[in-house]
């Protein structure tokens, strides 16, 4: 039997979607949440000096999206065909682009960097948010299934649903102009195994 361990900080962050893939699949795994002090001790023992790190029977795999894509293929939620997999990956890359574009706003908002939060919100976040959520809305309409690609859940459904939930936590009206995406978040987080995970996971700010 394969043994899985996911090593990440005591937060959702870049480790959460991998955790939700495990949860959806009903796959047991060790959810090792480390402190900053523990991170300093193990950093040099990780592949790229960063987390998350996935251990599969002791072998290490790094990079959050690579981990999620690997697990999704193992558990059948990467897309039902090579074409669907490519569509899912394209949305994943678009999501990454959005996060890069909006990063200065999020960092300033969380106090990690200086900057006028209100101005960054208007200049960076809003355009990036509107662009991405428009793209994802069109994907939902195109699939006609309630999922982003094809007729079943993929890892990108988990990723965008969690991001939508995080945004709604900060601003309950933010998806009022993207109601399809609001419904999508509710749908994904109502899936029994996902819902169960969200209810039992440690409470963290992000």
From Swiss-Prot:
Keywords: Transferase. Glutathione binds at residues 8, 39, 43, 49-51, 63-64. CDD domains: GST_C_Sigma_like (cd03192), GST_N_Sigma_like (cd03039). InterPro entries: Glutathione-S-Trfase_C-like (IPR010987), Glutathione-S-Trfase_C_sf (IPR036282), Glutathione_S-Trfase_N (IPR004045), GST_C (IPR004046), GST_superfamily (IPR050213), Thioredoxin-like_sf (IPR036249). Disulfide bonds: none annotated. Its EC number is 2.5.1.18. It catalyses: RX + glutathione = an S-substituted glutathione + a halide anion + H(+). GO terms for molecular function: glutathione transferase activity. It comes from the Eukaryota. Residues 2-79 form the GST N-terminal domain. The keyword Transferase applies. One of its GO terms (biological process) is glutathione metabolic process. Residues 81-206 form the GST C-terminal domain. Conjugation of reduced glutathione to a wide number of exogenous and endogenous hydrophobic electrophiles. Belongs to the GST superfamily. Sigma family. This is Probable glutathione S-transferase 9.
């Amino acid at each position: 039997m394969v043994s899985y361990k996911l090593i990440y900080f005591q937060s959702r962050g870049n480790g959460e979607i991998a955790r939700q893939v495990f949860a959806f699949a009903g796959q047991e795994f060790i959810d090792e949440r480390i402190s900053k002090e523990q991170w300093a001790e193990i950093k040099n023992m990780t592949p790229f000096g960063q987390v998350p790190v996935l251990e599969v029977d002791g072998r290490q795999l790094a990079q959050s999206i690579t981990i999620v894509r690997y697990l999704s293929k193992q558990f059948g939620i990467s897309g039902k065909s090579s074409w669907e997999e490519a569509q899912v990956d394209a949305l994943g890359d678009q999501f990454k682009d959005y996060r890069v574009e909006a990063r200065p706003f999020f960092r300033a908002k969380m106090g990690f960097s200086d900057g006028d939060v209100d101005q960054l919100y208007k200049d960076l976040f809003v355009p990036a948010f509107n662009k991405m959520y428009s793209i994802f809305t069109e994907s939902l309409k195109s699939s006609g299934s309630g999922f982003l690609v094809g007729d079943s859940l993929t890892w990108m459904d988990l990723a965008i649903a969690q991001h939508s939930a995080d945004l709604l936590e900060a601003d309950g009206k933010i998806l009022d102009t993207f109601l399809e995406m609001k419904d999508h978040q509710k749908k994904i987080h109502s899936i029994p195994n996902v819902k169960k995970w969200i209810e039992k996971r440690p409470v963290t700010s992000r």
